[in-house]
Amino acid sequence: MSLWLFFVQTVLLIQCALGGLPNAKDYLVAPDLLPGLNDVKDKELIPEMHAGHIPLDDGDDDDDDDEKNYFFWKFHDLANQTSVVASKTLIIWLNGGPGCSSLDGALMESGALRIDDDGEAYLNPGSWHTRGDIVFVDQPAGTGFSTVGDSKYDKDLNQVSKHFMKFLKNYFKIFPDDLDKDLVLAGESYAGQYIPFFANEILKFNSKLDKDDNEEESRSGKKYNLKSLLIGNGWIDPDQQSLSYIPFALENNLISTKADYFPDLLNMHSRCQNLVNNNGGKKFSFDECEDILTKILYYTRRKTDENGNKVPSNQECTNIYDFRLFDSYPACGSNWPDDLPSVSKFLGKPGVMDSLHLDVDKVPHWRECDSKVSSHLKNKNTQPSIHLLPNLLKHMQIFLFNGDKDIICNSRGVQDLIKNMKWNNHTGFTNDAEYYDWQYYDQFTDDTISAGFVKHESNLTYVSVYNASHMVPYDNALISRGIMDIYLKDVELVVGKDNQDDVIISKDFVVHSDHSTGEEELSADQKQDEDENSHKDRHRNSDKFEIAVILLVVFSITGTIAYYFLRERFRKQIHAILIDPENRPPSSNKSVAWADDIENQGDDFKLSIDEAPSTADKPAKNKSGYTKVPNTDDDSFELDNL
């Protein structure tokens, strides 16, 4: 450990011990201490980073949070790659589990860094930090690098929410400028529970400030500017989503109605349906329902391939996070993603934890998921987050995006929970819902890729992402970043003609690669600026040149004003999803608790994702048309519904 890092960590410990919080500069990460970043040729592309522990202790002697610390890692763009609206946006990213580290997101998904096979960091060209500052948080306590000490683990989502609010309060004390930014809560999987619960607490916090103007707040009484929730492949409605497993597996030819095991699966589905119908929303989830997926994996275990050849042991089980892949049994995806060993290698390298301001004597080595967190979080007296969504939709935009190759939180289940949810005086998407094909334009290859489709109504947006797994940004970060572009309205709209669907096109207004030489081709404007600067240096004292520059500026400003006036005058009418809502006219360990005791064994292999987009996830032209999950009045399971 360097003397500087030792000094910084000592300062952090002293400040925490005295009840104070460190300053933002105390959390600064030196990029040259992270293996691999010294090899980045264009150093300006390396984001500003802050990382470390933020204590949850708020001076309340009645709680036991003294030893709870949440680890965070923040990325801020320094290369002017963000738009104006993105520069005013703060994204907080949460991974799921429960108990799985958000460093999955930081180092394998939407974060600024990716890790190679040697455990060296390189820049992620599809990082979301170019669409807003992004903060990855390990929570609840005990997850990833976050510590629980001798305190108790959280038992339900209400406790988790209370602790997140403590983290948020102290975070904004350390980074007060972020209070003025638009807050976006984003994440995936079990974060489909976390995010709505946290949003609900933020609404209550803001409401309390409205009611009690005289209350003295250490944060000057400012509200949190929560604007949107982005939930990817979320576990939101355990009942409805468990009932999607058999229909989804049939739609994707993962099981067959002609198989000997199919009657047993039908019986399990029927038992689950009966429990759900008689639940009344009182129980968080049923083991009998979640066991359906476990049984599907058991029955579809492969011993031989279609040619009768013995299957390698690491290819026996379908990967529940990406059904194009296989894994050993009973891991069935727990060894995935392929980058996971590299991330562990990176975080275990000398100096990395020091650079992240972590005391190696007090913080254990990094584990992706912690079973103690998931085993304690039972939610015995808690309803799932689906019950919170209707009210949240009155106050903010909610985006539910889904990779279409995921099984455990599959697109069928998410579409069905939308279909059965009542909000804004209607149930599910109506015939008035907006529908768009979503395309991604690759400026390097000049190709347009079919990325998915988008459906929107009354503050709710559903985004299907083609050829993507449970971890959408892992498969294609550039395309996944288009979800943020849709939220930020940084997309192009092509209005369909002759009964064709409208098309949303996302593309990168700036895309950089750390593998570049630092001599990338300049845009026309950049070349002009460079030429002008050079010209000024050579003729600094020339009166004629100064006059020419003044005239050039005048003509440039005039031309720019004229361009924007004409563009606004003749541009196509943008649909509601792309209009500011305020101006809109009225109209499991790693898995989701399915196998906590699953063994981690074997290596999975990866198939190519460059295939034709799936059509199973795409609704019919009738905008209200979704396939049905069996849910009959007589509590029975009808095969015809499949």
Swiss-Prot record:
This is Pheromone-processing carboxypeptidase KEX1. One of its GO terms (cellular component) is membrane. Keywords: Apoptosis, Carboxypeptidase, Glycoprotein, Golgi apparatus, Hydrolase, Membrane, Protease, Signal, Transmembrane, Transmembrane helix. It catalyses: Preferential release of a C-terminal arginine or lysine residue. GO terms for molecular function: serine-type carboxypeptidase activity. The active site is at S189, D406, H470. The gene is KEX1. Residues 519-532, 632-642 have a biased composition (Acidic residues). Residues 566-642 are cytoplasmic. Its EC number is 3.4.16.6. The chain crosses the membrane at residues 545-565.
